[in-house]
Each structure stands twice: as structure tokens, then as C-alpha cells.
Amino acid sequence: MAGKARVHELAKELGVTSKEVLARLNEQGEFVKSASSTVEAPVARRLRESFGGGKAAEGAAKAPAKAAAKGDAKTAAKGDVKAPDKALDAALDNAIKAGGNGEAAAPPAQPGGTATTPAAQATPEAPARPGPAAARPSAPAPGQPKPPAPGQPPRPGATPGPRPGPAPKPAARTPRVGNNPFSSAQPVDRPIPRPVPRPGAPRPGAPRPGASPGNMPPRPGGVGGPGRPARPGAPRPGGGRPGGPGGRDGGGGNYRGGGVGAPPGGGGGFRGRPGGGGGGRPGQRGGAAGAFGRPGGAPRRGRKSKRQKRQEYDSMQAPVVGGVRLPHGNGETIRLARGASLSDFAEKIDANPASLVQALFNLGEMVTATQSVGDETLELLGSEMNYNVQVVSPEDEDRELLESFDLTYGEDEGTEEDLQTRPPVVTVMGHVDHGKTRLLDTIRKANVREAEQVTVEHDGVERPITFIDTPGHEAFTAMRARGAKATDIAILVVAADDGVMPQTVEAINHAQAADVPIVVAVNKIDVEGADPQKIRGQLTEYGLVPEEFGGDTMFVDISAKQGTNIDQLLEAVLLTADAALDLRANPDMEAQGVAIEAHLDRGRGPVATVLIQRGTLRVGDSIVAGDAYGRVRRMVDEHGDDVEEALPSRPVQVIGFTSVPGAGDNLLVVDEDRIARQIADKRSARKRNALAARSRKRISLEDLDSALKETSQLNLILKGDNAGTVEALEEALMGIQIDDEVALRVIDRGVGGITETNVNLASASDAVIIGFNVRAEGKATELANREGVEIRYYSVIYQAIDEIEKALRGMLKPIYEENQLGRAEIRAIFRSSKVGIIAGCMITSGVVRRNAKARLLRDNVVVSENLTINSLRREKDDVTEVREGFECGMTLGYSDIKEGDVIESYELVQKERT
């Protein structure tokens, strides 16, 4: 036994029990725990000697199987076919021991020598015949390795004999030709009788009867001598799936032909499920069914379900868009939000987003699956697939978002008995410098804020009125529109000496769009040149007909500076409110309102001026406004006093937001901070998607070349003192139209001072920071100087717009215009070791200047462009220019010149772009 041996293997070899072996080892001083323990080779040798196995037993166990097989082969070749059963059993035992535990052994044959394998029974014995049938070489017997090819040295360790210890190994003899499976010369075959197997019980170590040797490693070959050649045309036993055990006369299925008396060859072939039938058609391999763990038998084809058939039919009927087959709709409506991606669309129609991407690519538009897509693209793609794509408006989208949390906005809860009278909300609108703010100062005798509430006596009863001021600048269109939507009555201020101006018309349009009644205040009647009747005539063109002209619009002539007719104006406001409006609200519900303005205060954080429209806002309520949320920590009225609650039509400053809300965002009170945060997060994501879809520039395959060209882009970061100013500045800057070569992009915007975060973002994106009525905080200025970030400060919005427009014009690629200078004809060519080739020229027209651009003409064909006149000499002097009619020498840095060529000189003049 080579190497270490286990105790139970030694016990089986010696024919004793494991306990006896363990006891004997303990007597010899070897500490062995159990029958599965291993012992070294010297210990095993001493153990065999102690049991009296002698050198014969040791030699049988230690000698390689090759020597034993060679001896048997010699005996068979000499004709000694009547070997006793004991010799045969000893040879088989030696072969099994030498082959190891994992080798396959033959099951015991049935009494009488009948084989157990049907394939072996069906194969009759026949004498071997020379010829093509004997061309298959026989394999070595079990226990005998394959003999080496002629001229190849045998493997070391193949010599027989006992091995009591390290001893020199004698050289192996050259095997006979007949035992070499690779030799072309084969011995004359003669029938050799099989040795009679000994009947009895199966020996230890032999496989169980009926076990399949196909699951065992292959053996080198049979025990006997050269094998009997196969019969021509007969099927090979065991070809294909592994079968049952064969008889003693059956050769291995895929083994190299076993000799006479070899152990039974089971089904050969691949490892698979045991018990499969071997064979196939005569002369061919069996099928591979069952091989590599595959189930045998013919594959089953089940019937398709109705759903599978329907899916196949729908796929065949699906429309092909851009060469891609897509799902076919039934005309149903698909609702998508603004800035939806192809993944969102694919999820709605149960399609693959990659198919939609490929379809759009084939149609000429390049987008990704997660990229925001414009509304037109979604509608076009949906119409091709027979879907009606409906892009949800922002109002509907926000309403659906609130409904998902069981919330509503814009409706009073309760019955008619729960509604109570509220003060009117009045917005003052008009053109810039027409006296809006002065009018409010006169009304409240103090500086006005964004929203104020004053008390007016009407019919002997004091009634409060809430005023909202709006800017009159052109850039603040959105603020005027918000003021018109949040108000009940609009006061239109028109200067009597100036007349109707563009912002006046815009304010009229906003008020009429919001269906708000208008009271006209004709201001500055005390100024020289004032004509109130002219104002009435001009406003008639816009549908504002005075009552004295038979209309329903109240006109009041006032002077905000002198305080003239202010009471009549307030009286007109209350009369209009009582006549045309139902000013009632339910104060016993959760508060709802609108953020008029918002800014970032250094000491208090985000501060929002909120107008409560219905319900009551209290300190401690969880609120959400746009994409900002928080909890009310403090409320301040227009006088700077703290208040605990705010009733309908009451303006207050709310402190407690986590971020600055947008001007015009709806305010809503919710039950928990968690709900407020979820609503704010979803609104923020929706806003980002909509902004990405709006700012994405469509790139088609037709203009791909132009899109890939370098485009100048100016990145800006906007910071302002309040949200309305930042919004107005951004809209004004985005409205600048210069050229397609330059682009303006606002990468960030915010309320408050310029921070180090803004500077870092500007440094990373090569942006310019615009500060409107704000300054840099802390070390932001030092960081900007160190990083080279430019910060511009403005307090007038028009100045910022003009400078940004000039910067964009400076980023345009310059346009150069060619200005012809003169022509020179080459009369002679000189060569110099210092300057190279010199052209001796005559100036035929114009003037030639040094360092000017030149082109070389030969027979009126341009030979070279974009040359430079490096040097210019007249006689021996260096000159800057040579005029017509004079000779000169010049160098162009170009060697391919000939006499008669013409040098044309020109200069490029940059043309200013407009």
C-alpha cells in the first residue's frame, strides 16, 4: 500500500477485525484512536509482519499491478489455461488492492458462469477472426497499466517485487508487441478458454450486485490477456447511457476492449442517471439522453395557454415604430407628469424602456431611459403606439399628490353656518413710479411691507382691509400675477400726467384673467399737466368703462402726496367688496393660504410672509409650502408683534421653515411632520424633472454635427434678498436672446447671502455668482479670490441684465472679414543659409506689409493658404511695407515657390457681432 493506510483497510487486507488491528498497534507502541485513523508505511509493514502475512502478502499488496498482470499474461500466452481457482482469486485480489478503493470491480458471476447483463447474454461467443474486425486493439488487463509505446521509457515504479524499504528499482522489461495498443503489429489471435469463476458469496470490496459501474471511475482494463476482437457490425455493449452490470464475457462499453475473463463491463458512456439502457443503432454510439444530468427520453411539448397565444398574437399585431416592435394600445389615455422619462412611460404601458429608447433613436432623437422628455415627444410616441398621452398640468398633478394623502386645497370645510365674514384683500398694481407705495404709505402713515392690514371706518363701523403691494418693474410679471390671484380687489394706480403705460396694461390683463374687480385710482392730480379725463378715455379701450360713462368701474381722482380723496378710495373699495364679493371663510379648519414673499434672515432663518385664506394658523402647526416644510415656531404681524394665531385674510410672517419657500406657493397645514416632508420631497423631485425637461435641448441626428461643436456657455449662480427678486432676475436673464452659439444656464439659485458652498459650486462648474442686494458671508470672499471665482453685486435689476447681455455677446465667436492689401509677382529666387528661400518680387498693386497674411497663386490657382510674410527688405534695409511699383525681397516660410508665382497679401479684420 503506497503512502499512508487506514486501520480498517489494513484489517480488511489482513482478514481480521479493526479492534484486533488497534490492539496490535497499541502493543507496538503506536497511538491510534479509531478505525478511520491512518498509519505510516513502516508501521503498516511491521503490522503485516506481526500478523504473519509474510513477504508474499506484503509483495502482493505493495507491488504495482503491472507486474502481476504481466505474469498472468505470460502464463496465458504459454497456454497454461488451467490455473487453479486459488491463483485466479489471488490475482483478482491483488488487482483490486493495487487499483485502490475508488476503482470499479466486477460483481460476482452467477453459478454456472452465466452472465447477468442482457447485453452480454445476447452476444454469442465466436472465435476471433483476423481482418478488419480485429483492428480494435485490446486494452491491458486490470492491475496492468498501459504499456509504453515503442521507444518510450516505462514509468518509474512499475517493477514487481516486495518493497521492504527503500530499494533500487530494476529496469522494466520491454513489453510484448501484442500488449501495446498503439502498435500496428498485432499477434495472431487464438481463443483462450475463460477461467471458471468460483461460485459463492461476493468478496469484500466488490460492488453490490446490480450496482452500475457507470458511476465509478474507469478501470485500466480487464485481468486476462489480450482481448477478443469485436464482431463486425455488432453493437458495442454499453455505448450511450450507463446500463446494468454485464457478465464476465462482456467488455467495457467505452473501455478499451477487455480481455477474456475480464471483470464485467457495465454500461460505458457518459455519467448520467444509472439504469439507462445502453446501445443504439448497430455501429453507432448511443444517445446522449441522461448524459451530464439531463433527463432521458424525448422532450415534451406542452400545449400553449390562451395567455401565451394571446401574447404572441398581440406581438405580431404590435406597431413597428422606427424598426422596433412596440406594444399596441387600444386608444386608452396615459397620464404622465411634466418631465416624465421613458421609464415612466414604459411602466404605464408595461413595455421595455430600451425598446422606446431605440424607437426614438431610429426616429432621429437621442434620449436615455431616465432622461426627462418633452411633452411633444411623449405625445408623438404615444400616438404611434395608439395611446393618448396626456401630460398632467401642474395644478392637476399637485391636486393628485394631495389626494394621495387625503388632503384638499381651495375649499372651505363645513356648512354655511360655519362660514364667517373676513376682511377683503386688496392688491395695489400699476406702472413703476406711478405712486403705488406712496399711496399705501399715506393710508397707513408708515412704510409699507409686502402685506399690511389697516383699519378703515365705513358706515360708522371699523373694518379691516388687507393690502398687498406689488412691484411695477417689467421683470416682476410673475409677482403681479400672484398678487392678482391672491387678492379680492385690485386697485389700479395710473398717473394723471403719464397715462397708460405697458405695465399698466399688464396689470389690467392679470386682474381680468383672475376675474378680480378693479378700482382705478387716478393719482398725481395735483401735478401740472394732469388730465384725469384723458386717463378715463384711454382705459375705456381696455374694457374699464367709468360709471359716469355708463360702465361699472369706479374711478377715484386722488393725490397720494397730498392725501386727497384717500377716504373716497377706501369707501369705493368696500362698496365694491360688498356689492360683488362673498367674503366669508371657515376659521375652524386647518389653515390654508399662500406665501406672498419669502427671504432668508440671518438671525431667524427662512421667513415667509403668508396670507391666510381660510382656517386658522397656530404656533406649532406642521406646514408645507411648495417644496419647503417645517413647523410654525413663531408668527409676527405687520407691526413686529408676536401673534399666536392668524385668522382668514390675515398676513403674518411665519418662522420655522427648513428652507425658503417659493413666492406664490400654497401653504397647507398637515397632521404630522412626516406627511409634510413627504409632500415637499415629491414636489421637489417633480420640479427638478420639469426643469430638466424644459432646459434639455433636443438633439437630432440631422444636426448632430453642429451639436457636437463647441458651444460657449455662461453658467450663473443667482443669490438675492428674497424669492421674488431671484425669480424675476432669472426670468429676465433667460429671456436674453443672443445667438445659438452661446447659451445661458442658471445652475443654482437661492435666497440669502453668498456662502462658501456657492463659491465651491462656482469653482467646480466655472460659473459666475450674481448677488442681488446680498453680500458674501464669512470667508466666502477669501475663498472666491483664492479659487478665482468672479462675484458680481447688483442692486438694480436692469444693470444686471445689461452686463450679462454684454458678457454673452463677448462670448460669441468672432467673425473675421478679409481685407485685400496688395499683390506681388516673383521675379527671382535666392537661397540663403540663414533665412532659407528668398523671393525677389515686384509689387504690382496695393501694398505689402510685413507680418501680414499671404497666399501663393500659380496660374491663378491657390497653391498655399494662410502664409505669413516673415521678413520684408527693400535693397539692404528691413522695411515694414513696400508699395506698388517697387521691388523687394520677402520670405514666406514656404519653399515651393517658382518664378512667375503671385503672392497675394491680405489682413483679417474682426467684425463686431450684433
UniProtKB/Swiss-Prot annotation:
Keywords: Cytoplasm, GTP-binding, Initiation factor, Nucleotide-binding, Protein biosynthesis
Any one GO CC term of the record: cytosol
Source species: Mycobacterium avium (strain 104)
Biased composition (Gly residues): 236-296
Positions of region (Disordered): 52-84, 98-326
Protein name as annotated: Translation initiation factor IF-2
InterPro entries cross-referenced by the UniProt entry: EF-G-like_DII, IF2_II, IF2_N, P-loop_NTPase, Small_GTP-bd, T_Tr_GTP-bd_dom, TF_IF2_bacterial-like, TIF_IF2
Skewed-composition ranges (Basic residues): 300-309
UniProt subcellular location: Cytoplasm
Main subcellular localisation: cytoplasm
